[in-house]
Amino acid sequence: MRRRISAIIMTLFMVLVSCNSGGVAEDPKTVYLTSIANLGKGFLDVFVTFGDMVAGAFGIRADTKKSDIGKYFNDIEKTMTTVKKRLQDEVAKNGNYVKVKEVVDKFVADVLDKIAAGAKEAAKGATGDDKIRKCYFCWAWSQSADKDSVISLVKGIKTIVDAVLKDKGDAGATKTGEDKKDIGNLFINDAGKDGSKRENIAKAAASIGSVTGADILQAIIKSKENPNADSVNGIEKATDAAEIAIVPAVNKTEIKEDTAKKDAVIAAGIALRAMAKDGKFAAKNEEKSANAVNGAAASAVGKTLSTLIIAIRNTVDSGLKTINEALATVKQEDKSAEATNPAEATTSGQ
């Protein structure tokens, strides 16, 4: 990412050199290109922060707090807002270059605004000082995630995915076999806690490992925005990832609905329950089982967030390239009305 941004900045400076090589006094076009080049240097500082975000996503651990996930989304929102402001400030001062303004406006509306809005909404769902594992040696039964928190995560992630991933990934991805029927033990109540043993938890880990982060994200965004929780049948009636996340702890262990018996959906449900307020998992009262649950939860969240931030980086990188191409077009069209008579173009743009 740093090398790509550096290349963009170098191109901008080459444009400046070619503009000034004739010894002509600064005109609005030269001033504009100079300001964009300076903005490019600012990009290098702003977008390098994405590297820290990626490190944070890959560094998800069982003892990561839910509020840390919320901060992660808040940081994404702040970064997008900062970039938007810098771009719009420059466009406001140099509005006579219509082609560049159109590209920047589209980038802001289609990418930056959507990512920022989605991140802001998702952050509402990841709150509290509980750790994402929330399964301890002393904690035997599960607890459903707060419904409103899950809804915020689903809505927010959907907005981001629509901007950066589109239809990449498969919400119905599934590779494991009948073992999936035992994964419901993660959501059991105290009466059935002995079924939440390492052998069954390993089946959940297998589901998570068999799908991609994009598959998990697609399963999340295809969840209902108003999920239902069956207090009698529990996991047996869960139909999607959001409903798995909020399933009440009852003495039911088998995932029966065909729409939920998908590895991507199961992994997405575990990720949502781990990130959302109050969500907890069951484990047999032994250290090896507790560690297995913690590892599965961390894996699901880490894979989800890592894929999301990489997609954000790639999309923003692509947007910057498009802006750079627009700048190159302005240079090549010096004979256009806006370039051959900068003073008139500036006046007409005011």
UniProtKB/Swiss-Prot annotation:
Which segment of the chain is annotated as a signal peptide? 1-18
Q: What is this protein called?
A: Variable large protein 4
Report the principal subcellular site: membrane
- Name the family: Belongs to the variable large protein (Vlp) family. Delta subfamily.
Q: Per its database record, what is this protein's job?
A: The Vlp and Vsp proteins are antigenically distinct proteins, only one vlp or vsp gene is transcriptionally active at any one time. Switching between these genes is a mechanism of host immune response evasion.
What else does UniProt say about it? Genes for both Vlp and Vsp families are on (usually) unnamed linear plasmids in B.hermsii HS1.
This protein's GO cellular component annotations are: cell outer membrane
Kindly list the residues that the UniProt entry marks as N-palmitoyl cysteine lipid attachment points: C19
Against Pfam families, the record matches this protein to: Lipoprotein_2
Compartments it resides in: Cell outer membrane
Q: Which PROSITE patterns match?
A: PROKAR_LIPOPROTEIN (PS51257)
Query: Which source organism?
Result: Borrelia hermsii
What InterPro entries would the database entry show?
Borrelia_lipo
> What topology does it adopt in the membrane?
Lipid-anchor
Lipid moiety-binding region (S-diacylglycerol cysteine)? C19
Listed A to Z, the keywords are: Cell outer membrane, Lipoprotein, Membrane, Palmitate, Plasmid, Signal
